[in-house]
């Protein structure tokens, strides 16, 4: 579908429901604004526009008559595309979230293992410091005792967490088995 131009400006609203729906997504809209703000992208857009004006614009009047024959099919494809985007909106509501929220969620998900490792390291150092303070013995022997007792404390915490996790999974499995037996 041709978009009318006035003084070289393309109208901001395309005639396609699919494209309007697609441009309503914050991620796509922000991406387009970012590309338009980039000077290299502006040069590419100008080059593409000049190629369009040179090669495609003179041919468009000749394609008007054949376009009349295919326009119902184009409109139907546009309608199907818009309905598909509606289903995507229902199934994946995250596509409507603002770009900054998507960025922050993705960043926190990617950095989750790193942050947990930092927390674990800090916890072990805190346990070691408290064990070294409890022992009150200076020197290499005191540090060795603090290291061994830190290993015991951290192992005990890990086994306690694992025990509670497995107990919850065992209870969950027991209820599933009981439900299967009743059926």
UniProtKB/Swiss-Prot annotation:
Keywords recorded for this protein, A-Z: Lipid droplet, Virulence
UniProt keyword tRNA-binding, yes or no: no
Disulfide bridges in this chain: none
Subcellular location field: Lipid droplet
First-listed, main subcellular location of the protein, grouped into a coarse class: other
Induction: Predominantly expressed when Metarhizium robertsii is engaged in accumulating lipids.
Source taxon at top rank: Eukaryota
Disruption phenotype: Leads to thinner hyphae, fewer lipid droplets (particularly in appressoria) and a decrease in total lipids. Reduces dramatically turgor generation by appressoria and subsequent ability to breach insect cuticle.
Nucleotide-binding listed as a keyword: no
Purpose of the protein: Lipid droplet coating protein that regulates lipid metabolism, appressorial turgor pressure, and virulence. Appressorial turgor pressure is important for breaching the insect cuticle during infection.
Family note: Belongs to the perilipin family.
Protein name per Swiss-Prot or TrEMBL: Lipid droplet coating protein mpl1
Gene transcribed to yield this protein: mpl1
